[in-house]
């Protein structure tokens, strides 16, 4: 195992994820000092935010995020969210490489950067998912341009329902779901890095030390 290459991977991954999370916080109305430019407003059975109608679920998660930023700091919340997505997506990759899970993040093809988790759902093969999420997903699947939204809902559901992921890391905080980077599926995003990295060799995935080394390098 080449730890120098693992360090390069972890460093690059952290930079990509932190940039994505910070951008997401900005899109949700948070300034670098933790103050907000706008808050969602409840209306009837839902809410509005930045001129758009949003769900009660979004409103509740945004308020939870605002509370976390106020109680701690925006920098700490951003770090937590980036690492949450790092460790879970890396763990999923390790499970797949060891035959403990079906392919999730791998692409349907190199010409179309759509993860198999999404393409399978588009073909009617859904992961375990609660009724409310299934209703939202069914609406999203009517529009192939909403790949990011489809992936966000599916990967959150996958993490909640996978017993190994839950045993290792626990459940994802509700507000962390809002901070999944919107560029995570783009060319150069974190999923792209996972699928194309040369820093992690095939034999590395079979080593029980891999996740420990990546954690150490990520936080260093």
Where are these regions (language model features)?
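Preference for the N-terminal adenyl/adenosyl cofactor-binding alpha/beta module
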Residues: 1-220
């Amino acid at each position: 195992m080449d730890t120098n290459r693992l360090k390069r991977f972890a460093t690059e991954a952290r930079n990509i994820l932190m940039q994505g999370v910070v951008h997401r916080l900005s899109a949700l109305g948070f300034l670098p000092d933790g103050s907000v430019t706008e808050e969602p407003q409840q209306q009837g059975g839902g809410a509005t935010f930045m001129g758009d109608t949003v769900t009660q679920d979004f409103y509740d998660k945004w308020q939870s995020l605002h509370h976390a930023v106020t109680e701690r700091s925006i920098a700490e919340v951003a770090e937590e969210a980036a690492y949450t997505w790092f460790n879970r997506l890396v763990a999923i990759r390790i499970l797949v490489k060891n035959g403990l899970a079906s392919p999730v993040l791998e692409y349907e093809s190199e010409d179309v950067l759509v993860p198999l988790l999404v393409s399978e759902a588009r073909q009617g093969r859904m992961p375990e998912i609660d009724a409310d999420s299934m209703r939202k997903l069914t609406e999203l699947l009517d529009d192939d341009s909403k790949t990011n939204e489809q992936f966000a809902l599916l990967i959150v559901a996958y993490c909640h329902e996978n017993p190994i992921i839950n045993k290792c890391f626990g459940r994802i905080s509700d507000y962390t779901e809002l901070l999944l980077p919107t560029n995570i599926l783009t060319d150069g995003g974190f999923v792209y890095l996972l699928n194309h990295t040369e820093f992690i060799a095939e034999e590395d995935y079979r080593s029980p030390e891999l996740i420990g080394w990546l954690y150490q390098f990520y936080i260093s």
